[in-house]
Amino acid sequence: LCQFLLIEFSLSLRRKIFIWQAIVRDQSVSTKGFFCFTKLPNDLSAPCPIFTINFYMVVRIFITGGTFDKEYNEITGQLFFKDTHMHDLLEMGRSKVPVEIRTLMMIDSLEMTNEDRELIVRQCLNCEEEQIVITHGTDTMTETALLLAEKVKGKTIVLTGAMIPIKFGSSDGLFNLGSALAFAQSLPAGVYVAMNGRWFYGNNVRKNKQTGLFEEIS
Protein backbone atom coordinates (compact mmCIF):
# COMPACT_ATOMS: atom_id res chain seq x y z
CA LEU A 1 0.00 0.00 0.00
CA CYS A 2 1.14 3.58 -0.68
CA GLN A 3 0.53 6.71 1.30
CA PHE A 4 1.15 10.09 -0.33
CA LEU A 5 2.18 13.03 1.80
CA LEU A 6 1.90 16.53 0.36
CA ILE A 7 5.09 18.45 1.13
CA GLU A 8 4.91 21.37 -1.28
CA PHE A 9 2.95 22.56 -4.27
CA SER A 10 3.08 25.20 -6.93
CA LEU A 11 0.53 26.46 -9.43
CA SER A 12 0.86 27.08 -13.13
CA LEU A 13 -1.61 28.55 -15.61
CA ARG A 14 -2.18 25.21 -17.29
CA ARG A 15 -2.18 22.72 -14.45
CA LYS A 16 -1.49 22.17 -10.81
CA ILE A 17 1.79 20.47 -10.10
CA PHE A 18 2.21 18.85 -6.73
CA ILE A 19 5.50 17.71 -5.31
CA TRP A 20 4.96 14.62 -3.25
CA GLN A 21 6.91 12.15 -1.22
CA ALA A 22 5.81 8.57 -1.69
CA ILE A 23 6.37 6.04 1.05
CA VAL A 24 5.99 2.43 -0.01
CA ARG A 25 5.12 0.65 3.20
CA ASP A 26 5.82 -2.93 2.22
CA GLN A 27 9.26 -2.11 0.79
CA SER A 28 10.28 0.67 3.22
CA VAL A 29 11.43 2.77 0.29
CA SER A 30 11.30 6.56 0.24
CA THR A 31 11.38 8.20 -3.20
CA LYS A 32 11.30 11.90 -3.99
CA GLY A 33 10.13 13.32 -7.28
CA PHE A 34 7.47 15.22 -9.14
CA PHE A 35 3.95 13.79 -9.24
CA CYS A 36 1.59 15.50 -11.69
CA PHE A 37 -1.99 14.84 -10.59
CA THR A 38 -5.00 14.91 -12.84
CA LYS A 39 -7.15 14.83 -9.71
CA LEU A 40 -6.33 15.86 -6.15
CA PRO A 41 -7.44 13.24 -3.60
CA ASN A 42 -9.96 14.39 -0.99
CA ASP A 43 -8.36 12.40 1.81
CA LEU A 44 -4.56 12.65 1.82
CA SER A 45 -4.32 10.08 4.62
CA ALA A 46 -6.16 7.39 2.70
CA PRO A 47 -4.04 4.24 2.39
CA CYS A 48 -4.72 3.91 -1.33
CA PRO A 49 -5.96 7.17 -2.85
CA ILE A 50 -7.56 6.74 -6.26
CA PHE A 51 -6.30 9.24 -8.82
CA THR A 52 -4.10 9.30 -11.87
CA ILE A 53 -0.45 10.31 -11.46
CA ASN A 54 2.66 10.60 -13.57
CA PHE A 55 5.97 10.39 -11.73
CA TYR A 56 8.91 12.56 -12.77
CA MET A 57 12.21 11.78 -11.07
CA VAL A 58 14.51 14.74 -10.41
CA VAL A 59 18.09 14.08 -11.49
CA ARG A 60 20.99 16.02 -10.01
CA ILE A 61 23.72 16.86 -12.54
CA PHE A 62 27.20 17.71 -11.28
CA ILE A 63 29.64 19.34 -13.71
CA THR A 64 33.38 18.74 -13.24
CA GLY A 65 34.79 19.63 -16.68
CA GLY A 66 36.69 17.20 -18.89
CA THR A 67 36.68 17.06 -22.68
CA PHE A 68 32.88 17.19 -22.47
CA ASP A 69 32.96 20.93 -21.68
CA LYS A 70 36.13 22.08 -23.41
CA GLU A 71 36.10 25.02 -25.82
CA TYR A 72 38.28 25.26 -28.95
CA ASN A 73 40.39 28.33 -29.73
CA GLU A 74 40.40 28.57 -33.53
CA ILE A 75 43.42 30.89 -33.53
CA THR A 76 45.78 28.98 -31.25
CA GLY A 77 44.24 25.54 -31.69
CA GLN A 78 44.17 25.08 -27.93
CA LEU A 79 41.38 23.67 -25.81
CA PHE A 80 40.18 25.60 -22.77
CA PHE A 81 37.31 25.87 -20.30
CA LYS A 82 34.74 28.64 -20.20
CA ASP A 83 31.15 27.73 -19.31
CA THR A 84 29.37 24.40 -19.26
CA HIS A 85 27.39 23.38 -22.35
CA MET A 86 24.91 21.40 -20.24
CA HIS A 87 21.92 23.71 -20.66
CA ASP A 88 22.39 23.88 -24.43
CA LEU A 89 22.75 20.11 -24.69
CA LEU A 90 19.58 19.42 -22.73
CA GLU A 91 17.70 21.81 -25.00
CA MET A 92 19.29 20.32 -28.11
CA GLY A 93 18.33 16.82 -27.00
CA ARG A 94 14.75 17.98 -26.20
CA SER A 95 15.12 16.52 -22.72
CA LYS A 96 12.06 16.69 -20.49
CA VAL A 97 13.81 15.20 -17.46
CA PRO A 98 13.58 17.51 -14.40
CA VAL A 99 17.17 18.30 -13.40
CA GLU A 100 19.13 20.34 -10.89
CA ILE A 101 22.52 21.42 -12.29
CA ARG A 102 25.56 22.49 -10.30
CA THR A 103 29.10 23.15 -11.51
CA LEU A 104 31.64 21.82 -9.00
CA MET A 105 34.75 22.53 -11.06
CA MET A 106 35.88 22.93 -14.65
CA ILE A 107 39.15 21.02 -14.97
CA ASP A 108 40.86 18.34 -16.99
CA SER A 109 40.50 15.06 -15.12
CA LEU A 110 44.28 14.56 -15.26
CA GLU A 111 44.51 17.61 -12.99
CA MET A 112 41.91 16.31 -10.53
CA THR A 113 43.25 15.94 -6.99
CA ASN A 114 42.17 13.78 -4.07
CA GLU A 115 40.58 16.89 -2.56
CA ASP A 116 38.55 17.39 -5.74
CA ARG A 117 37.28 13.82 -5.56
CA GLU A 118 36.38 14.18 -1.90
CA LEU A 119 34.37 17.27 -2.84
CA ILE A 120 32.45 15.23 -5.42
CA VAL A 121 31.78 12.55 -2.80
CA ARG A 122 30.48 15.11 -0.28
CA GLN A 123 28.22 16.72 -2.86
CA CYS A 124 26.73 13.34 -3.77
CA LEU A 125 26.17 12.48 -0.11
CA ASN A 126 24.62 15.84 0.77
CA CYS A 127 22.30 16.44 -2.19
CA GLU A 128 18.64 15.52 -1.76
CA GLU A 129 18.36 13.77 -5.11
CA GLU A 130 18.88 10.02 -5.25
CA GLN A 131 19.65 9.97 -8.98
CA ILE A 132 22.88 11.73 -9.98
CA VAL A 133 24.74 12.26 -13.25
CA ILE A 134 28.35 13.50 -13.17
CA THR A 135 30.13 14.82 -16.25
CA HIS A 136 33.81 14.00 -15.94
CA GLY A 137 36.99 13.76 -17.97
CA THR A 138 37.51 10.24 -19.29
CA ASP A 139 41.18 9.82 -18.31
CA THR A 140 40.52 9.45 -14.57
CA MET A 141 36.77 8.87 -14.58
CA THR A 142 37.21 5.33 -13.28
CA GLU A 143 39.22 6.55 -10.27
CA THR A 144 36.39 8.84 -9.21
CA ALA A 145 33.83 6.11 -9.85
CA LEU A 146 35.75 3.70 -7.63
CA LEU A 147 35.90 6.20 -4.77
CA LEU A 148 32.19 6.96 -5.08
CA ALA A 149 31.37 3.25 -5.08
CA GLU A 150 33.24 2.90 -1.79
CA LYS A 151 31.74 5.91 -0.03
CA VAL A 152 28.24 6.60 -1.36
CA LYS A 153 25.45 4.10 -0.82
CA GLY A 154 21.74 4.17 -1.57
CA LYS A 155 21.94 6.46 -4.61
CA THR A 156 22.19 5.85 -8.34
CA ILE A 157 25.25 7.72 -9.62
CA VAL A 158 26.25 7.68 -13.29
CA LEU A 159 29.49 9.21 -14.54
CA THR A 160 29.82 10.12 -18.20
CA GLY A 161 31.93 12.26 -20.48
CA ALA A 162 33.13 12.66 -24.05
CA MET A 163 36.13 11.70 -26.15
CA ILE A 164 35.55 14.67 -28.48
CA PRO A 165 34.64 18.20 -27.28
CA ILE A 166 31.03 19.25 -27.77
CA LYS A 167 32.18 22.28 -29.77
CA PHE A 168 33.64 20.01 -32.48
CA GLY A 169 30.14 19.11 -33.66
CA SER A 170 30.89 15.41 -34.09
CA SER A 171 31.17 14.86 -30.34
CA ASP A 172 29.89 11.76 -28.59
CA GLY A 173 28.95 13.95 -25.62
CA LEU A 174 25.26 14.44 -26.38
CA PHE A 175 24.74 10.71 -26.92
CA ASN A 176 26.59 9.85 -23.71
CA LEU A 177 24.64 12.43 -21.72
CA GLY A 178 21.32 11.03 -22.92
CA SER A 179 22.44 7.53 -22.02
CA ALA A 180 23.55 8.65 -18.57
CA LEU A 181 20.24 10.36 -17.83
CA ALA A 182 18.33 7.25 -18.88
CA PHE A 183 20.56 4.94 -16.84
CA ALA A 184 20.30 7.18 -13.77
CA GLN A 185 16.51 6.83 -13.86
CA SER A 186 16.41 3.10 -14.52
CA LEU A 187 19.34 1.41 -12.78
CA PRO A 188 19.21 0.42 -9.09
CA ALA A 189 21.28 2.21 -6.47
CA GLY A 190 24.99 2.00 -7.21
CA VAL A 191 27.78 3.77 -9.08
CA TYR A 192 28.10 3.36 -12.85
CA VAL A 193 30.03 4.66 -15.83
CA ALA A 194 28.03 5.35 -19.01
CA MET A 195 30.09 5.49 -22.21
CA ASN A 196 29.75 4.15 -25.75
CA GLY A 197 26.06 3.35 -25.27
CA ARG A 198 26.78 0.96 -22.40
CA TRP A 199 26.82 1.11 -18.63
CA PHE A 200 29.51 -0.40 -16.43
CA TYR A 201 29.78 -0.93 -12.70
CA GLY A 202 31.96 1.81 -11.23
CA ASN A 203 34.27 -0.68 -9.55
CA ASN A 204 34.71 -2.89 -12.61
CA VAL A 205 35.56 -0.65 -15.55
CA ARG A 206 38.61 0.80 -17.27
CA LYS A 207 39.41 2.97 -20.25
CA ASN A 208 41.30 1.12 -22.98
CA LYS A 209 44.09 3.52 -23.95
CA GLN A 210 44.57 1.81 -27.32
CA THR A 211 40.96 1.82 -28.52
CA GLY A 212 39.64 4.78 -26.53
CA LEU A 213 36.70 2.64 -25.43
CA PHE A 214 35.55 1.69 -21.95
CA GLU A 215 35.45 -1.98 -21.03
CA GLU A 216 34.88 -4.30 -18.10
CA ILE A 217 37.96 -5.29 -16.13
CA SER A 218 36.77 -8.86 -15.66
Give the positions of each predicted feature.
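Extreme N-terminal basic, low-complexity initiation segments
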Residues: 1-12
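Serine residues within intrinsically disordered or low-complexity segments
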Residues: 10-12, 28-30, 45
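Compositionally biased, low-complexity segments
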Residues: 6-8, 24-26, 41
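Intrinsic-disorder-associated, low-complexity terminal segments enriched in Asp/Asn/His/Tyr and depleted
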Residues: 26, 43, 54-56
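Active-site histidine-anchored catalytic micro-motif
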Residues: 57-218
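Basic polycationic patches enriched in arginine
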Residues: 14-15, 25
